[in-house]
Curated annotation (Swiss-Prot):
<dbReference type="GO" id="GO:0005829">
    <property type="term" value="C:cytosol"/>
</dbReference>
<dbReference type="InterPro" id="IPR005793">
    <property type="entry name" value="Formyl_trans_C"/>
</dbReference>
<comment type="similarity">
    <text>Belongs to the Fmt family.</text>
</comment>
<dbReference type="InterPro" id="IPR044135">
    <property type="entry name" value="Met-tRNA-FMT_C"/>
</dbReference>
<keyword id="KW-0808">Transferase</keyword>
<dbReference type="GO" id="GO:0004479">
    <property type="term" value="F:methionyl-tRNA formyltransferase activity"/>
</dbReference>
<dbReference type="InterPro" id="IPR037022">
    <property type="entry name" value="Formyl_trans_C_sf"/>
</dbReference>
<keyword id="KW-0648">Protein biosynthesis</keyword>
<dbReference type="InterPro" id="IPR002376">
    <property type="entry name" value="Formyl_transf_N"/>
</dbReference>
<dbReference type="InterPro" id="IPR036477">
    <property type="entry name" value="Formyl_transf_N_sf"/>
</dbReference>
<protein>
    <recommendedName>
        <fullName>Methionyl-tRNA formyltransferase</fullName>
        <ecNumber>2.1.2.9</ecNumber>
    </recommendedName>
</protein>
<dbReference type="InterPro" id="IPR005794">
    <property type="entry name" value="Fmt"/>
</dbReference>
<dbReference type="Pfam" id="PF00551">
    <property type="entry name" value="Formyl_trans_N"/>
</dbReference>
<dbReference type="InterPro" id="IPR041711">
    <property type="entry name" value="Met-tRNA-FMT_N"/>
</dbReference>
<dbReference type="InterPro" id="IPR011034">
    <property type="entry name" value="Formyl_transferase-like_C_sf"/>
</dbReference>
<dbReference type="Pfam" id="PF02911">
    <property type="entry name" value="Formyl_trans_C"/>
</dbReference>
<feature type="binding site">
    <location>
        <begin position="114"/>
        <end position="117"/>
    </location>
    <ligand>
        <name>(6S)-5,6,7,8-tetrahydrofolate</name>
    </ligand>
</feature>
Length: 320
C-alpha cells in the first residue's frame, strides 16, 4: 500500500522505522517545522524528518491545514495529490481537519499511547504514571475530528512498574506502537478486517491527559510518599520534579524510591537521614521518600553517594 506518515518526535520515528522495513511504500512524510534546539538554538529537524531524509522520502512541513487560508488549502490539495491508500499519524502535533482525514482511501490511523478512551490528549504516558495506573498500552484508531475520539481497531497492553519513569515507559510504548501499526497494516486485507471490526469508544469511560505544565512538577511535601514518588517518575524526563530552594534556585529530582526510614512527628519536607540509599524526606500522612538522584543548578545529576559527598543538604533541614 501507499502510505503517508505524519509524526514528529522519537515516539513517531520508532513507528516509521518499523514501517520502512515492510513491503509498503512510504510515499511522503509530514512533520512539524524545524525548531530551535540545544544551547546554540540551531534550527533542528524532527527525529521523523531526519529518518525520512536518510531514506530519501519527500518531507512536507506545513504550518497547518486550515482551509480558511491559502496555505492551508494548498497543503490539503498537496496531500490529496499524493494518492495515498492510508495515512499513519503518531504524535504529529497538528490538527487534521475532516477533509484531510477523508483524503486517503482508508482514512487516517493514529498510534496513541494509552488504552483509549482512558487518557485522551497530550500527556497519556505521564498521567498514567502520576495517577498510579498499573497498566497502559497502545491503541490504534481510525481518526475522527475530535481529540482522540476515533473508533478503536487494535490494542496492546503494557504493565507499569514501580520503577518506570515517563522516559522508560515512552520507549516501551514506542516499540509496542511500531509493532501494533505493522500488525494492522500487515496487508490490505488485514487492514480491511480491522476496519470492519472497529469498536466505538465508550464516552462514559473517557479520562483526559491534560498537557503538562512546569509548575505542577514542584514537589508538594504534604502529599504522601507514594504520590510524590509517582510524580517524580511521571515528570522524568520533562519537566523534571523540583524543590524550590529559594527564589532563584531549584533542585531537580530525577529519581526516588519509597523510604524504609521513619521518624516520629517528622515535619513534611524534613530531611530525616542521608545515607548510601539517598536523601530520606518526610512526606504527608507520616510517610517517607528517598531521593536517589538530584541535580543542583548548573551541575550534573548526582547519585546517592555523590549527594552525600556534596554536604549541601543536612539532616533536620526542612525542604520548602
Amino acid at each position: 500500500m501507499k502510505i503517508i506518515f505524519a509524526g514528529t518526535p522519537e515516539f513517531a520515528a520508532t513507528a516509521l522505522a518499523a514501517l520502512l522495513k515492510t513491503s509498503h511504500e512510504i510515499i511522503a512524510v509530514y512533520t512539524q517545522p524545524d525548531r530551535k534546539a540545544g544551547r546554540g538554538q540551531k534550527l533542528t529537524p524532527s527525529p521523523v524528518k531526519q529518518l525520512a531524509l536518510e531514506h530519501n522520502i519527500p518531507v512536507y512541513q506545513p504550518l497547518h491545514f486550515k482551509a480558511s487560508t491559502e496555505e492551508g488549502l494548498a497543503a490539503q490539495q498537496e496531500l490529496a495529490a499524493l494518492g495515498a491508500d492510508v495515512m499513519v499519524v503518531a504524535a504529529y502535533g497538528l490538527i487534521l481537519p475532516q477533509a484531510v482525514l477523508d483524503t486517503p482511501k482508508y482514512g487516517c490511523l493514529n498510534i496513541h499511547g494509552s488504552l483509549l478512551p482512558r487518557w485522551r490528549g497530550a500527556a497519556p504516558i505521564q498521567r498514567a504514571i502520576a495517577t498510579g495506573d498499573d497498566e497502559t498500552g497502545i491503541t490504534i484508531m481510525q481518526m475522527a475530528a475530535g481529540l482522540d475520539t476515533g473508533d478503536m481497531m487494535y490494542k496492546t497492553y503494557c504493565p507499569i512498574t514501580s520503577e518506570d519513569t515517563s522516559a522508560t515507559l515512552h520507549d516501551k510504548l514506542a516499540a509496542q506502537g511500531a509493532t501494533a501499526i505493522c500488525a494492522v497494516l500487515e496487508s490490505e486485507e488485514t487492514l480491511q478486517k480491522y476496519l470492519a471490526e472497529r469498536e466505538v469508544q465508550d464516552e462514559s469511560l473517557t479520562v483526559y491527559a491534560h498537557k503538562l505544565v512546569k509548575s505542577e512538577a514542584r514537589i508538594d511535601w504534604s502529599m504522601n510518599a507514594v504520590q510524590v514518588d509517582r510524580n517524580i517518575r511521571a515528570f522524568n524526563p520533562w519537566p523534571v520534579a523540583f524543590i524550590q530552594l529559594d527564589e532563584n534556585n531549584a533542585l531537580r529530582v530525577w529519581n526516588s524510591t519509597i523510604s524504609s526510614q521513619s521518624k516520629v512527628n517528622a515535619q513534611a519536607g524534613e530531611i530525616i537521614a542521608i545515607d548510601k540509599q539517598g536523601v530520606h524526606v518526610a512526606c504527608g500522612e507520616n510517610t517517607f521518600i528517598c531521593l536517589t538522584s538530584v541535580q543542583w543548578p548548573g551541575g550534573k545529576a548526582l547519585n546517592a553517594q555523590q549527594i552525600a559527598q556534596t554536604q549541601k543538604l543536612h539532616v533536620g533541614q526542612i525542604l520548602p
